[in-house]
Amino acid sequence: MQNEIEMLRSIRQSTEMGCSGIRAALPEAQNPAMQSALRSQWKEYDSIYAEADRLLRERGVRLSGVNPLAKYGSMLTAKLRVRSSRNTTARIAEMLVQGNTRGMVKSMQNLRAMGVLDPKVSSLSTRLLQTEQANIEEMKHFL
C-alpha cells in the first residue's frame, strides 16, 4: 500500500507541475494550433491529477500540493525563456518536450522501483506515461 501511495503522490505532483507549466506557457503562445494543443494537454493532466487525488483520498492520505515557491520559480523561468526567444512557439514546444521527458523518466523509474501495484494505480501510472509520450509527439510538430 505504501508503494501505491508514493506512486499516486508522484503522479499527482507530476500532473500538478504539468498544469502549472502549461498555465504559464498558454498566455505566451501566439499560434492557435499551439494554444489548442496546450489546452488539450492541460485538460488531460487535470483529469489524471483528479483521479490520483481521488485514489489518495480513498486511502485516507492527507494531501499537500507542490511547494508554491517551486511553482512560482518554474513559472517565472518559463515566461522569461519564452519572452527571450524570437520563435515563441518553438521555445514553448522545446520546454514542454523537456518537461514531459523528465516526467516520463520519473514515471518509468517509479514503475520499475515499485513493482506490482493495485490495478487502478498501475493503470493511472501507465496513462500518465502514455500521455507524456503523446505530448512529446504532439510538440515535435512545433519545434
Question: Which residue ranges define each predicted feature?
Answer:
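Alpha-helical bundle segments that constitute or directly flank the non-heme di-iron/ferroxidase center
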Residues: 1-29, 91-115
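Amphipathic alpha-helices that form helix-helix packing interfaces
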Residues: 11, 18, 25, 48, ...
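Short, flexible helix-adjacent loops and helix caps
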Residues: 23, 27-34, 57, 61, ...
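Preference for long, well-ordered alpha-helical segments
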Residues: 92, 99-143
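Carboxylate-rich helix-loop segments that flank metal/cofactor sites and access channels
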Residues: 54-104
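Charged/polar, solvent-exposed surface patches and flexible loops
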Residues: 10, 24, 36, 40, ...
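Alpha-helical scaffold segments that form or flank carboxylate-/histidine-based iron centers
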Residues: 3-11, 32-50, 89-96, 118-131
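Conserved alpha-helical segments that form or flank metal/cofactor-binding pockets of metalloenzymes
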Residues: 36-72, 138-143
